Amino acid sequence: MAGLPNSSNALQQWHHLFEADGAKRSPQAQQHLQQLLRTGLPTRKHENWKYTPLEGLTNSQFVSIAGEISPQQRDALALTLDSVRLVFVDGRYVPALSDATEGSGYEVSINDDRQGLPDAIQAEVFLHLTESLAQSVTHIAVKRGQRPAKPLLLMHITQGVAGEEVNTAHYRHHLDLAEGAEATVIEHFVSLNDARHFTGARFTINVAANAHLQHIKLAFENPLSHHFAHNDLLLAEDATAFSHSFLLGGAVLRHNTSTQLNGENSTLRINSLAMPVKNEVCDTRTWLEHNKGFCNSRQLHKTIVSDKGRAVFNGLINVAQHAIKTDGQMTNNNLLMGKLAEVDTKPQLEIYADDVKCSHGATVGRIDDEQIFYLRSRGINQQDAQQMIIYAFAAELTEALRDEGLKQQVLARIGQRLPGGVR
C-alpha cells in the first residue's frame, strides 16, 4: 500500500532498532520485520486507517531506552489489588519489581521462544512491528483444572523522554489456559512521566475446552502517548471468555481484539469503554469468527467523547458456513459531550450459514436536556448532573468488574476524564 510521506523514515528507524539487537532476534521476529517493511505504513486513503492519524507518530525520532525505576515509583503508579504482579518497564521484564509466581497457579517463563505461538488472526502493520521489536515473550500457563486464587496482573510502565525523541516499548505475552482451568488476567498500562512515548502490545490467549477466562485491560497512559495493541483470543469447545477493556488515556490509542470460536458451545463477551478528550483519538476494533456452531457472543462497546476528541469503532462478526445455531450480537453506543466531538462507527456482519441469530447496532447521541432538567430540579448543579448521567452510561461496563476495589479505581480514572475532572 502507499505509505505516508515520512513512512520510509519511520520504517528505517524501526529497522535500525531491530538490527541493534539483531543477533538476539528470533526467526519469527525476522519474518515479521520483513512483512513490516514489505507492507509499509498506511495512509488516510486506506479504509481501515481513515480516522486514525499517524503523522504525529511517524515523523518522530525513535529510541529504545532501558529505564530503571524504584519500587516507590512502581507503587505510585500501581493498582491497589491483591494479585500476582509481573512488572515490565520500557518493554523489559523486571524481576526485582515483580512477585514470585511459585505456587501461584501461574507457570511463567520469559524468553524469545516463539515457535509455538499462534498465527495472527488479523495481521496488520503495527502487529508486525510489535512482533519484531518485542525483546521477549512472556509465556504464561495455567494447568488443567487449576484455578489460581489471585488474578495475574501484568503491569507495563513506559517512560517518555524530553525533546524530540520518542521512546518505543513493545510487550509480547501469551497465555495457555488448559482444559477446565479458570483465571483472571489484568493488563495495566501506565506512563512513568508526562513526556510522549510509543507503546506496542500483543497478547495471544488459548482458552481450552471447558476453560474460563476473565480478561481486563486498563490503558491509563499519558495524554501524549501512542498505544497500538493487538489481542487474539482462541476458544475451544465449551470455553468461556469475558474481556473488558477500559481505554482511558493516550493521544492516539488503537486497540484490536480478534477472536476465533473454534469449538461448539463456546461463550464470548467483549466489552469496552473509550473516553477520548481534548484532541485525542481512540480507535476500537473487533474481529470475531464464529467458526463452529452453537456458540454465543455478546459485544458492548461504549464511548464518551469530550472536547474535540474522536472515537472510532469498527467491529465485524463473521459466521462460517457450517456454524449453525450461532447467536451473536454487537452493540456500539456513543455519547458526545462537545459540539466538536466526533464518532465514526461501522459494525458489520458477514453470515455464510443458515439458522443463525445475529444482530448489530450503533447509536450516537448527546445528553438529554430533559434528564438534566430533572436533576437540576432536584437541586443538583449542572456539572454534577452531567457526571451522574455519564457514570450511569458507563455503569453497564464498570459493574462487570467483580473486584470492588478495582472497580472504584476505574471509576476514579473515568472521573478524571469527565468535564470538570482533573486530567
Regions found by a protein language model. Name each.
Residues G116-I380, A394-L397, L401-R423:
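Conserved beta-strand/loop scaffold segments within soluble protein domains that form the structured core
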Residues M1-R202, A209-H212:
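Short, low-to-moderate order helix/coil transition modules at the start of elongated helical scaffolds
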